[in-house]
Design a protein with these regions (language model features):
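Conserved catalytic alpha/beta core of Sir2/sirtuin-type deacylases, generalized to analogous enzyme cores
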Residues: 1-285
Length: 285
């Protein structure tokens, strides 16, 4: 499959604006690049400012790789994770990127499929019934085994952990335990096949499939934002297939390394540019 690239920005943005206006349905695919464009940080000065103690102790350089670190005990692990969750799930508010995107689609029949777990779409006031976040949510905990298929809001516990941690440890009594089996809890993230899919997950999946079925018979804009090749089977490849099989579909992708396959190149718009700038231009069109 040969990929096509488009380095010019102005005309592709006009094309996306026209396709958006003409579309009966808009399917948004959002990856990590969208939140990065909105100012969410994971390394550099931000990491040093907020995790200097962990960086000094273990040589950590960024939040992503630090999340895989085998901490020696639960009290230290949850000191790190509570601080990280607090910053990226509760303290950092969605900014202009999400507001510009909502401005573009709030009067359209839209749906959002996202691999992001920062809850930004809901916090930016997108309609919850039009969201399917497939990979979990930093704001939810689950049994690590798991012994049952349920998730639990963690806001109050996370805030308590952050407030009471000292020397990279939380009090032992704050370590979360499964309310059923008493075992370890973990964040509801899709790292492997133990990720809990609760009734809310299945309800969202059903709404997404219903939207996709209707979109397959409609004039549809598939708008992909910040989606790389980390998990292409969730958003990118399905979007390519949907565009290929629906002659009334148009695929638009925006990221610094955006590409589209040759087979749908005549109905694709590729913008290799900063997502924030593109959405700002579109929202002001």
């Amino acid at each position: 499959m040969i990929a096509t690239r488009n380095s010019s920005t102005h005309k592709p943005i006009e094309t996306i604006a026209n396709e958006l206006e003409r579309a009966d349905k808009v399917l948004i695919g959002a990856g990590a690049g969208l939140s990065t464009a909105d100012g969410f940080e994971y390394s550099g000065a931000w990491f040093q400012e907020n995790f200097s103690d962990f960086a000094a102790a273990y040589g950590m350089t960024d939040a992503y790789t630090a999340g895989f670190y085998p901490f020696p005990d639960e009290t230290e692990k949850w000191a790190y994770w509570s601080r990280y969750i607090n910053h990226n799930r509760y303290l950092k508010e969605p900014g202009s990127v999400y507001q510009d995107l909502l401005t573009l689609v709030h009067n359209k029949d839209y749906f959002v499929l996202t691999t992001n777990v920062d809850h930004c779409f809901q916090r930016a006031h997108f309609d919850k019934q039009r969201l399917f976040y497939t990979q979990g949510d930093y704001g939810l905990w689950q049994c690590a085994t798991p012994c049952h298929q349920a998730t639990y809001d963690n806001h109050d516990q996370v805030v308590a952990m952050v407030a009471q941690q000292h020397d990279r440890h939380i009090p032992a009594e704050l370590v979360p335990r499964c309310p059923r089996c008493g075992g370890q809890m973990t964040t509801n993230l899709r790292a492997d096949d133990t990720c809990v899919q609760d009734p809310g997950w299945y309800a969202a999946a059903k709404r997404y499939q219903a939207f996709v079925s209707e979109a397959a018979q409609s004039r549809t804009l598939l708008l992909e934002l910040g989606v790389g090749m980390n998990t292409p089977a969730i958003i990118k490849y399905p979007f390519w297939r949907m565009t290929y099989h629906n002659p009334r579909a148009h695929y638009a992708t925006v990221s610094l390394d955006a590409v589209a396959p040759k087979q749908i190149s005549e109905r694709s718009t590729v913008v290799q540019a900063d997502i924030a700038s593109v959405l700002r231009l579109l929202a002001g069109a």
